[in-house]
């Protein structure tokens, strides 16, 4: 039986014809039976694809033949094509939607004016040298940080990357502008952009972790400064860096430690992802996001003895 894997990758490089790159990438992925999501813009490419390991290796080889992608780094993760519903290859104004396509500048070396890149070991060395002066700044959506983050990290109150500019311009973080700020995200791409946006807004000493949380976790597992699970945007929904991880998330109903996000049972107008322990998710009466309307719907199902997950 063939072994399957997931690839995570990105490259910031000027692309004069994103549409041509889109057509080439779609044809390449289809020929290798890969599924996943790829975004392309004039700034570069951002992708996550899964499939048989030999097909993934062939994809890496072919993709690196393109001049702008010849130095692109690929991160391997557990999973495969089945973790994605289909193959999606799209052209967008941005490969990460911060809402600042005209502010971001890239050249053949990547993002212009971004934060200083630190290897995982250098992150630890910075903390050892500067202590509590160092601030970890989460570059992900606030929901992702519920199940894992760097120790004592600042977690901005954002639902999407589009919210970051208003958040950092709000004045909430002005006290960090003279401190060493280490931005981090899943694989590094969001912080390539976020760090440059922060520098443009007066943050004087900004860093980013090479390869993001994934690279840091691969090197240090659960023995470093990372705590908990890593949220991922596929069917797995979370991954860990070894079996000795700590569950830092808590069920919204009973406060039991959990790293499992579940959808609210109100399928018509909610379906919000919230943290629920197995027991509370199994109980129809508590399988909701705690909004009043959703709680009422759950109570109605429970009273009628109906479980929406049980098919006849």
Swiss-Prot record:
Catalyzed reaction equations: uridine(34) in tRNA + AH2 + O2 = 5-hydroxyuridine(34) in tRNA + A + H2O
CDD domains, per the entry: RHOD_YceA
GO biological process per UniProt: tRNA modification
GO molecular function: oxidoreductase activity, acting on paired donors, with incorporation or reduction of molecular oxygen
HAMAP family: TrhO
A Pfam family annotated for this UniProt entry: Rhodanese
Gene designation: trhO
Residues of the active site: 185
Role: Catalyzes oxygen-dependent 5-hydroxyuridine (ho5U) modification at position 34 in tRNAs.
Keywords: Oxidoreductase, tRNA processing
Protein known as: tRNA uridine(34) hydroxylase
Domain of life: Bacteria
InterPro entries tied to this protein: Rhodanese-like_dom, Rhodanese-like_dom_sf, Rhodanese_C, TrhO, TRHO_N
Root EC class: oxidoreductase
Record-annotated Rhodanese domain positions: 130-225
PROSITE patterns documented for this protein: RHODANESE_3
EC number(s) given by UniProt: 1.14.-.-
Family: Belongs to the TrhO family.
């Amino acid at each position: 039986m063939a072994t399957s894997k997931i690839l995570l990758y990105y490259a910031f490089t000027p692309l004069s014809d994103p549409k041509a790159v889109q057509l080439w990438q779609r044809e390449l992925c289809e020929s290798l039976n890969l599924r996943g999501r790829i975004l392309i813009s004039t700034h570069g490419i951002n992708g996550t694809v899964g499939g048989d390991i030999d097909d993934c290796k062939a994809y890496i080889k072919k993709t690196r033949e393109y001049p702008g992608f010849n130095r692109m780094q690929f991160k391997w993760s557990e999973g495969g094509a089945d973790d994605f519903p289909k193959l999606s290859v799209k052209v967008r104004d941005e490969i990460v939607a911060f809402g600042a396509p005209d502010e971001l500048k890239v050249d053949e070396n990547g993002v212009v004016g971004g934060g200083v890149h630190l290897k995982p070991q250098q992150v630890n060395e910075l903390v050892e040298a500067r202590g509590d002066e160092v601030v970890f700044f989460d570059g992900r959506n606030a929901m992702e940080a519920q199940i894992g983050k760097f120790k004592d990290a600042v977690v901005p109150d954002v639902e999407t990357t589009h919210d970051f500019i208003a958040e950092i311009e709000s004045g909430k973080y002005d006290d960090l502008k003279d401190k060493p700020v280490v931005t981090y995200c899943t694989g590094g791409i969001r912080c390539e952009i976020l760090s440059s946006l922060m520098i443009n807004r007066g943050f004087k000493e900004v860093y980013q972790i090479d390869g993001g949380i994934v690279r840091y976790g691969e090197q240090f597992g659960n023995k470093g400064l990372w705590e908990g699970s890593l949220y991922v945007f596929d069917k797995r929904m979370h991954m860990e860096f070894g079996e000795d991880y700590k569950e830092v998330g808590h069920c919204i109903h009973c406060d039991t430690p959990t790293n499992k996000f579940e959808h609210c049972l109100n399928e018509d107008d909610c379906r919000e992802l919230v943290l629920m322990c197995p027991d509370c998710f199994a109980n129809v009466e508590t399988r909701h996001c705690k909004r009043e309307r959703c709680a009422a719907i759950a109570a109605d199902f429970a009273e009628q003895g109906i479980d929406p997950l049980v098919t006849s």
